[in-house]
Structures are given as structure tokens and as C-alpha cells.
Amino acid sequence: MTPKSAALVDDLVSILKSVQTKRSAKGFLKKLFPQPNEDATPSSTHQAPPVRLAVTKLAGVETIADDTLFGIGKTIQRMSRLGMQSIIVPSMSTPTGLSACFASGKCASLAQVNELREQLRTQELSQLDRVSDILCQAGVLARPSYGTLYASNADGVSLEAQRLLLETLQNGYTSVIGNSVVNPGLCLTQITPDQVVLGVVRSFAQMKSNVSVERLIVIDEVGGMPCPRRSHGSSHVLINLAQEYVSLWPTLSPKHAENLQLVNSCLDLLPHSAAAIVTTPDAAVFNGSTRQSHPIIHNILTDRTVFSCSLPVDRSPETKTTLLRRGTPIYMYHGTDCLTNGSVSWDRIWYLLNDSFQRVFDMPRYLERIRHNLALVIVAGDYEGVAIITLEQPQTPGAAPVPYLDKLAVLQKVQGTSAIADFVFNAMCSVFSQEIVWRSRLDNPVNKWYFERSRGSLLSRSTPWRLFWTGYKSADQKRIQEYLDVIDSIQPTWIK
């Protein structure tokens, strides 16, 4: 077995250790070893294999130490073995030379343009050489693209050498590209590394070829977007841009806000399955022993974060990495009005529950049960996920109502990698932050997921249920008994 084959076997074994479900493992293996199209014509079978692409921005590259850059190169090499090719865009911390001229917006003669290009070679291209050399030392087939220029037009910056760059990727090379732009009138235009990254993503997204941009990676000393709920400046684990972008952006520092805006603009151009990773240079280093906890490699393997965003904060490790997805909007309907005013489609919820649980749900009997105590309905996207919370009255006289998670369901086709269950669970906990309870059968394969997110758990002595609860409120023995009374008294509403 060759060293490359042995490394690939190690990665495949890592999949089995790191994924939580067979569905996730099968999904990755399908990407790594795509099945041939049975309907393919003889001519189509000779086409180049599909290119799965990651576009990586190396921010402040001149401040990244050589050994750190070498470790990042090992990560890029591992990504390539896992079927993900890379385009690297190194960026300088401060605008110099040509970038400063671009910022002035002044027009120039052809001679001046050529002179400024020479300045670029001495300032910016030296970093292209450095990055390429170190990546090669790390085992990456890196190729600096000195002549890759971009065109500036009304739509922004676009890549002019698409086909050449695509051929480079198809041949297994990693392209390291610079940041120079001249518009058709030879008028120098301001350009930033973010515009270059966006231009590359836009160009490949619009390109009618066998290539898909699956990841945007931003390696920046500031790391992921900080989360106020997490200690010591730890980052958001996962951001649902469809739900959180507008409210999150104004709260961030200028650098974090720039990175968030770049990610949002790029993911808007890409398929819903694409994702972005924002992390630090140190976290991006691969040393061989960090495969299962490496934020980039783990995500390539599983489409997930290293740990879930819906875990209790005090049980989550510190992180400087944020995974971002276009995600899905979350809609909340409070109280019982949504039972009758048409704001919620109960027919679609019935279909969702049947699909998720693979059972037939008795919706008329269920609606009768909740018509006086429905507290909240949470709908994810186009009825891709749902949570139904009721307020249940314990048997103890004068006891406070118990918030009860009656139903949590996700369509089967989006289970596993979409994080919809996490988004819905987080939304629920944001409303019922003090306490909420739910129950599960002892043989439910989802119980591991429930254990990780609960503050406590207890077996019922009289029914086949396990009680779970979470929230900031500390539950004493009396309150826990009230929880048990609630879960024991509710009758299931399944037909079969």
C-alpha cells in the first residue's frame, strides 16, 4: 500500500469514528466515490472528473509564521486527498503599492499601469512565492498564478482566466493567486482581497462546467465570530445566516463584520449545501493527531461542526472557529391562535411528522389535546422542521405549568447535515430558557442527542419513558416529580 493510499484509509476509518449516523457516513462516501451515471454516453465517460472546490482566503499572510503556514499546507494536502481541491488567495494586512493606487481611484496611462504592476511583483508576488514554496514543502502541488488577472465591470470583479485555472485544478494542482485588477479603460480601481475571493466564487458559480464551490474558508487571526453567551471570547459554533445575519452584523467588530459580509455574499451565489469556515491560522494547522477535532478536516468529512451548537454552553469547549451556512429562516407562532387563523399549515405539519417518524399521526385527536395549552410552534424554512411546545399542568395543586416539548421533527431528506434540529432546538431554548422538558422511549436512537442537550434525565417508574429536562432554572426533587407526572400522563397520538 502506498503512503497516499494508507493516508486515505486512515481518513476513511476516521469517518466511521467521527460521524454520529450511518446516513452521514454514506453521504460522504458518495461524494468521495461517486457512482458512474448509468445513462452516460460513451463520449461523456471520458470527461474530466468533477472538481469539488474550496476557496481559501489567507488574511494577513505576511504575519503567519512559516511553520504555521506549513501546518496549514498539511491541511490543504489532506483536503486534496479527501477530494477537495483548493484555490488560495493570500492577502496582506495593509494596502501597499498598487493597492494604495487603486484606493485613490486615479486613472493612469498604460506605462503607469505597467510600472505599478512591477511594484506589485516586488510587494505582493513575493508572498505568492513564499506561500507556494511552503505549501510545496508540506506536500501540496501548489502553483502560483502570477498572470491571473481580474476584470472590473459593473457587476464587480470577475476572473478572466477561468478555463486555465480549471485545468490546473483538474490536474490536481492548488492555485495560489494574487490581487491585481485593471478595468477595460485602464482606469485603476480599488480592489480588496475580499473582492478577489468574491470574484473567484462568482466566476466559478456562473461557469457551466464540472466544478462546484463547496467551501469558503477564511483563515484570519481574529478567528470566528465571537459569541457573547460563551466565555473567554469563544466563537459562535454555527451561524444560520438566513436567521441571524441581520441582527448579528451590527454587533461585530469591523474585521469580524467584514468576514461575515464576505461569507454571506459568497454563499448567496452557491448551492444551499455549500458552507463557510472562519478560523485562526493556529486552528487550521494539521499535525496528524487532530483529525477528529480539526475544524476544517472534520467538516469536510462529516459536513458538521466538531461539536454541536445546541449543546449547553457550559458543556461546550472553547473554540475560535465558526461554521456558517445559508441556513433556513425560523418562524415562531405563540399561543393557540395559530390553531385556527391559518398562519400554520397543520396539514404540512402532519406530513412532516409522518415523514420524520415513519408513522401515521392522528392529527385531529392531537389538535384536540393541545387546543387549550399550545404555547409555541416553531417552523424551520418550508416546513423542513418543526417543534411544538405545550404548557402542561402537573397534578400538584398550585404548581407552575411545565413547558413540554411535545414534538420535534425534521424531514428525512434534510436530516444529518442541515443542522435544522439544532436551529429549532436553539430557538426553543431561547424562548424557554428557564426550563423545558421532553420524553423519549428507552430504545430511541436519538437519545444520545437528547442526553447531550439535557441538564438532567430520569427513568419513569410507571411508563416506558425517559424524562429529559434543560434550562437555567435548577429543578429540585419536587419539581422533577412534577415533570414525571406530566410525561406519564400524556397519551401518544399515533394511529400506527
Curated annotation (Swiss-Prot):
The keyword Mitochondrion applies. It is an enzyme of class 2 (transferase). Its EC number is 2.3.1.1. GO terms for biological process: L-arginine biosynthetic process; ornithine biosynthetic process. Coiled coil: none annotated. One of its GO terms (cellular component) is mitochondrial matrix. It catalyses: L-glutamate + acetyl-CoA = N-acetyl-L-glutamate + CoA + H(+). InterPro entries: GlcNAc_Synth_fun, Vertebrate-like_GNAT_dom. Residues 333-493 form the N-acetyltransferase domain. GO terms for molecular function: L-glutamate N-acetyltransferase activity. Pfam families: NAT. Keywords: Acyltransferase, Amino-acid biosynthesis, Mitochondrion, Transferase, Transit peptide. It is found in: Mitochondrion. Pathway: Amino-acid biosynthesis; L-arginine biosynthesis; N(2)-acetyl-L-ornithine from L-glutamate: step 1/4. Belongs to the acetyltransferase family. N-acetylglutamate synthase involved in arginine biosynthesis. This is Amino-acid acetyltransferase, mitochondrial. The lineage of its organism: Eukaryota, Fungi, Dikarya, Ascomycota, Taphrinomycotina.
